[in-house]
Amino acid sequence: TVIDHLFRSLQANRFLEALEETVDVARATGQRAEAYHLKAAGEKNWPKMAQAIAMVDAARAEGLDVSANMYAYTAGATGLTAALPPWVQAGGHDAMVARLKDPAIRARVLAEMRDPDVAWENLRLLAGSDERLILIEFHDPALKPLTGRTLAEVARERGTSGEETVLDLIVEDDSRVGA
């Protein structure tokens, strides 16, 4: 049995390609294949779910033993770091925070966070609005009162953009900040 867990980078804009690869592995090996956590993250990707189900149905009609399981809920949880480019996270948390404190790197990160056409999947943009991002976990006691608030609310109160607020909270809390 081949089990393919569709991890964060393959649960949104590229999830159809990931599912196609799972089907291709089943076809090439003759083994049973299951796509775990099949989901279309991001409102713009929701219409693609019908195509994903059709892909599984077509594979089964072809005689392949292919299946998928899906999340049974309409929300997810991650960290605000899921809104950052992968390169800024390289080397671990401490290296990332050091980069986010560098004004030149911070400017580059902000530009990439605002670009809907970057190659990486920005889960903040996929959410569709900072009103949909609820802050759920802080380590710093001074930030804990923000728990349960939306990113949009906190950004408005601080007078900063959503992107700047993401970076500020990650640095201030010295954590990924649950959202």
Feature annotation, model-predicted:
Residues T1-L6:
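Extended, charged catalytic domains and RNA/DNA-binding interfaces, predominantly
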